[in-house]
């Protein structure tokens, strides 16, 4: 069985789009095939500078896959392609 994809969500508190992406990832995680973690960009000045105006940003296996919005079907398609 292949290793699950690694998904990282870069977000910040008070970001409603981030909350939407988190809800989608939590819902889809039960299907398997990926694990995910969240990084608060405001906890690291370098990340804050890099992603300040782009959150939420989603990386799949180290490659940027989405920023701002992420639809469930697009995520599943991207997950399968990586």
Language-model features: locations:
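Residue-level recognition of oxygen-bearing side chains
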Residues: 20, 46, 74-75
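Structural micro-motif
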Residues: 52-58
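Local sequence-structure signature of Cys/Sec-based thiol-disulfide redox active-site neighborhoods
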Residues: 1-27
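Short helix-capping segments at alpha-helix termini
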Residues: 29-33
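Non-catalytic, surface beta->alpha helical segment in thiol-disulfide oxidoreductase systems
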Residues: 60-82
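Thiol-based oxidoreductase modules, predominantly thioredoxin-like and allied folds used
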Residues: 34-45
């Amino acid at each position: 069985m292949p290793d699950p994809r690694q998904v990282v969500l870069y977000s910040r508190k008070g970001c409603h789009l981030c909350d939407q992406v988190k809800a989608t990832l939590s819902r889809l995680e039960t299907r398997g095939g990926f694990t995910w973690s969240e990084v608060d960009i405001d906890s690291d000045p370098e990340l804050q500078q890099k992603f300040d105006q782009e959150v939420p940003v989603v990386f799949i296996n180290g490659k940027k896959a989405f920023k701002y919005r992420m639809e469930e079907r697009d995520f599943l398609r991207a997950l399968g392609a990586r």
